Design a protein with these regions (language model features):
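Active-site-adjacent helix-turn-beta-strand microarchitecture at beta-sheet edges
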Residues: 113-187, 192
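Zymogen propeptides
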Residues: 34-135, 150, 212-213
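Bacterial N-terminal signal peptides
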Residues: 18-29
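Conserved, well-ordered active-site substructure
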Residues: 117-136, 187-238, 245-295
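Catalytic metal-binding/acid-base residues of hydrolase active sites
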Residues: 112-113, 243-245
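Active-site neighborhood of phospho(di)ester-bond hydrolases with catalytic His/Asp-centered motifs
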Residues: 107-109, 237-240
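Short, solvent-exposed aromatic-acidic interface loops
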Residues: 84-87, 157-164, 214-217
Length: 295
């Protein structure tokens, strides 16, 4: 029998099929959707602060709207909680009034509250309670400004596994709310069918803090799923208050550097106080530059 010519048409067609298969594997390996996960383009606001308008798109089956994400480095900024009664005020201010009063670079709503404006859960300021009792079900606790210098400067505690003593708190600032996504990647909210504007605080694997505000209504479960898929660097996340209380505001001096540009930044209308009606907020979290001493 005559030996086969390896360059014959039959062998060339087999070789061609293998080339196509390998090319397909290569395409899968550099799937654009995976590559999108994520080329986030951050705009620097100040030392330790950056911002972007994140577009989840078809990564989240178009169920989740674009969201403003503010990234904060706890080594360069500090966090402080506020409640209007602790400030000696008769009525809760709106977010812009909170910013003017405190001088914060960034102001964001905190967790949920009752009809009498009492905070629902743990709320600490400078190590003392300015909120209610520990909520028995909600397991998310945003903490900042540790008592001991060897602790991280800010982060999220999962109260289902992390210890936190109210008698001897390890952090001076704390706000309790609903856990969304834990450090094992487990979703901690159920699908409810209810939608609202949402505010989320997240913690990346490198310790940076994310403040996330959706630009439209979305369910918490859908948002949690989207964050897990679209932001793989996100280690854990918890929901703050939502609906009409969802608010994120930048100080005028941070926005001033973008004045005079031909077009406003795509995120600007959502954080300059012009894009929505602002209701009074009993409690807020402020972000401030950290002193040179790092205190």
């Amino acid at each position: 029998m005559e030996a086969s010519d390896p360059t014959s048409n039959g062998h060339r067609s087999v070789l061609g099929r293998w080339v196509l298969v390998l090319a397909g594997w290569t395409c899968l390996a550099i799937d654009p959707a995976a590559a999108e996960t994520q080329e986030i383009r951050w705009e620097i606001l100040a030392e330790g602060l950056a911002i972007t308008l994140w577009e989840p798109g078809d990564r989240c089956e178009d169920e989740v709207p674009s969201s403003v994400i503010l990234k904060a480095d706890p080594g360069r900024v500090r966090f402080a909680t506020y409640h209007f009664r602790d400030e000696g005020l008769a009525e809760p201010p709106a977010v812009r009034d909170w910013q003017r009063r405190t001088g914060a670079s960034v102001m964001v709503n905190s967790g949920l509250f009752l009809e009498d404006y009492s905070y629902l859960g743990i709320l600490l300021k400078e190590g003392r309670s300015i909120g209610g009792k520990r909520h028995p079900i909600w397991q998310g606790l945003f903490v900042a400004e540790p008592v001991q210098p060897d602790l991280r400067k800010a982060g999220i505690l999962d109260l289902s596994v992390d210890h936190f003593s109210l008698e001897r708190p390890a952090y001076r600032e704390a706000a309790q709310s609903l856990m969304l996504l834990d450090r094992k990647g487990k979703l901690r909210v159920r699908r409810s069918g209810r939608q609202a504007h949402q505010t989320v605080v997240g913690e990346n694997g490198d310790g940076t803090i994310l403040l996330i505000k959706t630009t439209a209504a979305v369910g918490l479960r859908e948002l949690a799923e989207c964050l897990r898929v679209g932001l793989p660097e996100l280690r854990q996340a918890m929901a703050l208050d939502g609906g009409s209380s969802s608010d994120l505001l930048l100080a005028p001096d941070l926005l001033g550097k973008f004045e005079g540009e031909r077009e406003p930044a795509p995120w600007q209308e959502f954080v300059d106080g012009s894009g929505q009606r602002h209701i009074p907020l009993p409690s807020v979290i402020g972000v401030f530059p950290r002193s040179e001493e790092g205190k």
